[in-house]
Amino acid sequence: MFHTFLIKYAEIGLKGKNRYVFEDALVSHIHHSLKRLDGKFTVTKEAGRIYATAAEEFDYDEVIDALKKVFGIAAICPMVQLEDNGYDDLKAKIVEYVDKAYPDKHFTFKVNTRRANKQYPHTSEEVNRDLGEVILDAFPETKVDVHNPDVLLNVELRAKRINVYSLVIPGPGGMPVGTNGRAMLLLSGGIDSPVAGYMIAKRGVTIEATYFHAPPYTSDRAKQKVVDLAKQVAKYAGPIKLNVVNFTDIQLYIYEQCPHEELTIIMRRYMMKIAEELAKKDDCLGLITGESIGQVASQTVHSLAVTNAVCTLPVFRPLIGFDKQEIVEISEKIDAYETSILPFEDCCTIFVAKHPVTKPSLNVIHNDEKKLSEKIDELMQKAIDTVEVIHIEA
């Protein structure tokens, strides 16, 4: 019975004169999301409302699933649109709506009328009362409950038509991707970084990604795991450019030249340097990591300060105060968890010291990095010049 979806947004409504930029971006993303499905949809914007209307038969569950992955959507409301053919016709159509939408009539309800068309000849209170009466007359087993109803029947009286809906499906929230700049995600095969990318994309940021590969110490299966995680993030964030950096020579050279308790922090600093270079090439305005304070030795406050010192771009860490279980729950929600726990090691887990430093000194790290001489710069440039680019589609 539903061929139209009312799509609500939240934060976008708080924008000022540039609100149309966010609305247009959201309309575009909704259109792109539905275009991949069977069935033709038109997506329109009208007076603070966005409508997606089907021109032919479609899979209802597929549509809901697709829309729940579009950032910027606060709620999805399957609805019917009625022509304004008079008050008696509205009463008859409401009874028809309830009859089709709710086969089991044992429920409590409330009618909630929004009179956007101020010229409508009846007040909201009158419509609430009169529609409630016809529902009770038609279906005596129903009951009115204005405080905690099972069904909230929304009636929007607009200038050209009347919208009726009672199901409100939560959307992902956030802002439309692409309305808030571009940033580079340091993506590994773990649980955290895909979640970090998801969360920053939710704030409207276009995501690119960099993965550090260390063959033969990391396998092609480890690389494919990261590609699969990028695909999962792309379902929400849209297309992602994935840079695959061969980090083997850099990693081995650091391992040979530097104290082993500092390996992780020094390797991390060079990863940040390379990611920043790639970010600047593509006009990214920041880096994104999945770090959370105290989770591992390289994520203590002292370690993060030393890592940050190597960057000129801002580093966004959306998981910084999260417990691991909170991160896992988001990973499961975006269907990344089962892939993240596949047992293929990445370069961050192979060259790990038994007793890594947890309170590194920036001066000490600087002195130890001097041992790497000019050769490390050559290795970095080679890694940047030989990057493999994989374009990930949603």
Model-derived regions: residue spans:
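RNA-binding accessory domains that recognize and position tRNA/RNA substrates
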Residues: 1-184, 194-240, 309, 357-362, ...
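A conserved beta-strand->alpha-helix junction
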Residues: 230-256, 346
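A short alpha-helix-loop-beta-strand transition element characteristic
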Residues: 335-343
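Active-site adenylate/phosphate-handling loop in enzymes that bind or generate adenylated species
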Residues: 133-135, 168, 173-180, 251-252, ...
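Conserved G/P- and acidic residue-centered "switch" motifs that form tight phosphate/ATP-binding loops
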Residues: 190
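Structural beta-sheet core signal
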Residues: 185, 209-211, 244, 289, ...
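Small/polar glycine-rich anion-binding or flexible loop at a beta-alpha turn
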Residues: 295, 343-351
